[in-house]
Amino acid sequence: MSEIISIKDINFKSGSKVFVRCDFNTPMDEFYNITDDRRIRSAIPTIRYILDQGCSVILASHLGRPKNGYEEKFSLLPVAKRLSRLIDREIIFANDVVGNDAKTKVAALKQGEVLLLENIRFEKGETKDDVALAKELSEYANYYVNDAFGVCHRAHSSVHAITKFYDEEHRAAGFLLIKEIEFARNLIKRPIRPFVAVVGGSKVSGKLQALTNLLPRVDKLIIGGGMAFTFLKAIGENIGNSLLEEDLIEEATNILKKGRELGVKIYLPVDVVAAQTFSAESAIKYVSTQEIPTGWMGLDIGPASVRLFREVLSDAQTIWWNGPMGVFEMDKFSKGSIKMSHAIAESFATTVVGGGDTADVVERAGDADEMTFISTGGGASLELIEGKELPGVKVLLKAES
């Protein structure tokens, strides 16, 4: 793979405007208070670096998936306020993306100032990789920097089409994007061994390609979460009413077989927290995976599985974790995921956490500071591990000389 153009490769001309695509897709409560500002904090090194070059910065991001233009719950105004506090300077906020307010504020932007555009997905063309929208955005700035790893797997207008309007000397990847790619590449190509992958989440279908790509590279593989039940079914266990992807039993069998051929040890849960219904009021039982009663379903890994997995991790030098061990959103089914987070955080390994739900588990467990690296992108992180080329990264590669 060619080398990516870094922000450090660009000779920024003082007084220029720089368009920075960020990922400020942050969770908020019902009062629009940001509950986790990790993604905002992650963008700060790139913003500061550009300001230090004597430029002004135009920030663009999405938040959620708005369907019909402006919706208050998807506004980036709370992000502007939080970012202002974090970098201790005024953030000018535009009430639109390519409307009069944005254009007026971009034109008036002075050296050293920072402007945040409203949610870029309020423009319908964004998710369609619309070239006309990309051209309008490109007219705002002399340089383009992508620091939004979390959307690099999507060919969207502000990530993909916009790069057509900047040559190699005027487009680059920001510090966060480069860091994300380096961690993923090293994980796949140069892991320090023993390398253990911990894969959870609800569905095998979402992780199938990642599992296939990881198998020849890992020493041990732990499979938990809802997806484990398809594997347990494949080895003949009675899984009751637990989540099952029947059409993938054969694929699960093939993965287990391939693991044996490659000498990779694959570990599945040995016990679960079972309930008859998924609700806070439902009675629970701790049962072995061989004894899940008919009509009951496994919703978290049990204490014996936690002990087993902790033992498996004890000699690891590299750990990659993607996907919770149970339905962690509900307290009574979150213990397995929380304990797994503690076990990974306490290890002496290089620990890389895939974004999305897994990052939320780590935050909730209070282990964020103990992990080596927490990815800001769930889907993008997974696609890199799957060996796929990300559209937003491909357009930032140096031309083959």
UniProtKB/Swiss-Prot annotation:
Location of this chain's protein in the cell: Cytoplasm
Entry EC number(s): 2.7.2.3
A cellular component term, taken from the record's GO annotations: cytosol
Binding site for substrate: D23, F24, N25, R39, H62, L63, G64, R65, R121, R154
EC class name: transferase
Keyword ATP-binding: yes
GO MF annotations in UniProt: ADP binding; ATP binding; phosphoglycerate kinase activity
Listed pathway(s): Carbohydrate degradation; glycolysis; pyruvate from D-glyceraldehyde 3-phosphate: step 2/5
Binding, ATP: K207, G298, E329, G355, G356, D357, T358
Reactions listed under catalytic activity: (2R)-3-phosphoglycerate + ATP = (2R)-3-phospho-glyceroyl phosphate + ADP
Keyword RNA-binding: no
UniProt entry keywords in alphabetical sequence: ATP-binding, Cytoplasm, Glycolysis, Kinase, Nucleotide-binding, Transferase
A biological process from GO: glycolytic process
Predominant localisation class: cytoplasm
Domain of life: Bacteria
HAMAP family: Phosphoglyc_kinase
Family: Belongs to the phosphoglycerate kinase family.
Subunit structure: Monomer.
This protein's name: Phosphoglycerate kinase
Organism field: Campylobacter fetus subsp. fetus (strain 82-40)
Gene (name only): pgk
